[in-house]
Amino acid sequence: MAFSIIMLACLTVCVGIDYLSLKHIDQNGALLGVTLPPDAAALPEVQSIVQQYLRWLRIICLLCAAGGVGLFFLPDSLLRVMVWVYFFFGSLALPYLPCLWANRTLQRLRDAHGWPAAPGDVPWKYGLFYYAPDDTRASVPKRIGKGTTANLAALRGKLAVAVNVIAIAAILLTGPVLGVLDHTPARLELQVSPTVELQSYHGKTRKYIIPLDSITKVQVYPSLPEAGRVGGIDLEHYWQGTFVMVHDGTVHLCLDPTAQVRRMH
């Protein structure tokens, strides 16, 4: 529950910032990223596009902020964390969809009226992406919203975008990777040749070997004693690494904590 409360608070703040930023539609003489003649902004068709843009921006931001409440009802598991992460990043991206629509619609209106395209519009794609090989700046002021955006033609701009893309991709892929680890069975197998030993596996990966002649005692626990992770992974169905266990001290584990536990000495 605490995780969901923190995520909902962060989501509400970030979506609110998105909304307040994207409300600023007139930047450097360009309306929603498109430069129009001086009196064109007052035309009914232009005002209709602007009003539709602002209306859909409000609707999407409200739905994204309110949608997080529904995630409180998901069971407390790795799945809920994954859904929250994907929903969070999706909610930050969705408010930009009205920007793409409004920019393209205004461009078509400009072309239909025969208004010339301003030279400053050429480097901008959909009013959001800036690509100007002759501009040495790594970042420039946004045309829709507040803040700056990277120059995708500059080396520093490309590096900044690449770092952000890699970081976001790593975050989005962490959940599925942990999900695979959590649902891959951990097991012990008895190996009799060439030596008699117990081998611990997680899926097809062998984690450690216990020679049979080194086992002096076997104890069965109906449930796993209270333990704290020192290093490693502690998922819902998979623990691997070093743990401190009540009455047993430091132990090395590779097991399903929900299964019956056999402690070997």
Model-derived regions, located:
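Conserved beta-hairpin
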Residues: 24, 28-31, 100, 179-211, ...
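Non-transmembrane, membrane-adjacent beta-strand/coil modules in membrane-associated proteins
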Residues: 119-132, 201-265
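Membrane-proximal soluble regions of multi-pass membrane proteins
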Residues: 20-33, 108-155
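Transmembrane-helix bundle segments that line or gate the permeation/cavity pathway
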Residues: 1-118
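Internal/C-terminal transmembrane anchor helices
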Residues: 156-178
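Acidic, Ser/Thr-rich low-complexity segments on the non-lumenal side of membrane proteins
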Residues: 48-60, 134-135, 140-141, 208-220
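Extended interaction regions within the primary functional domain
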Residues: 70-74, 80, 127-128, 141-142, ...
